[in-house]
Amino acid sequence: MPQQSMQASLRDPIAEIERSNCKIAHLRLGLVFTSDNNERALQDSGLYSPDSEDSSVDIAGRRFHSGTLNGSSIVYVKTGSHSVNMATTLQILLARFSIHGVIYFGNAGSLDKKTMVPGDVSVPQAVAFTGVCNWKKFRSEKGKLVFGDFNYPENGENLLGTVEYEKIKMFSPSEAPKEVFWLPITKSWYNAATEALKDMKLRKCYSDECLPGEPKVVFGSKSSTSDFYVRNKAYGDFLNDNFDAKTADTTSASVALTSLSNEKLFVVFQGVSNVAGETSSNSRVSYLASYNAFLAATKFINSIPTPRLACE
């Protein structure tokens, strides 16, 4: 019988495994990101090699690529921005491919420039959906976000009232559904990342653009995810003061929730591309943030044991 092509195998990811008579729980690492900038960082690095000329497959409008990243077997996919696209694409990845764990890299905004500035990479310890809320009636006494506190030039009443932040329901195959706010990064992978990246040197310049200082990797922070990108300083300060969130993006919590619901290992690498309330970084600095996040993700991937076939 003629052997199936790689693309056919990817359409039915267990086909090759069944032919080999290997019983295997996991085969590859899943690498996910949102933007063209992120994908360009991967391609520009020269570290990715496709398995063959026919090693990609389109599912539900997303293209999944099978190959190696500096020798480690991966499937990567560009998900598109915002939480619904990330969650949908990641669920397809986990349902259709044999994935050992999920690595996300992408861009985020800093909510505390004393902690992180453009070019730095954050490896958060926990992420949360801060866009899930109950908008209260005017003069409600409940709600953490009080719009009247932000009236200018003086505080006072505001018809927008207050907003109460809510937990989300997390489903899991082995536990009853439960409500959670903070979603913890897989502890073993977070610890592995802190060890692998503790002395990492990031890229400072791209083209003729250089960062004013040496970029660094920051560990152990918390991150906020919502479907709006936070550029407003007052709201960024609110998230920092009330939730101790140091970065904000539109996707990390979706990676966390989907991975946890499927009981998969996962880790997040955020390249800081701007500071809330300050002038937006130019495209070269934004790309540099993507590239540094990619470098951190790659070094982590190459530091963990490679998933093996059970019959090897």
From Swiss-Prot:
InterPro entries: Nucleoside_phosphorylase_d, Nucleoside_phosphorylase_sf. Coiled coil: none annotated. Induction: By photoperiod. Short days stimulate accumulation, while long days inhibit. It holds the Pfam family PNP_UDP_1. Residues 1-24 form the signal peptide. GO terms for molecular function: catalytic activity; nutrient reservoir activity. Bark tissue. Glycans are attached at N70. Keywords: Glycoprotein, Signal, Storage protein. The keyword Signal applies. The keyword Glycoprotein applies. GO terms for biological process: nucleoside metabolic process. It comes from the Eukaryota. To wound-inducible poplar endochitinases. Monomer. May play a role in nitrogen storage. This is Bark storage protein B. It comes from Populus deltoides. The lineage of its organism: Eukaryota, Viridiplantae, Streptophyta, Embryophyta, Tracheophyta. The gene is BSP.
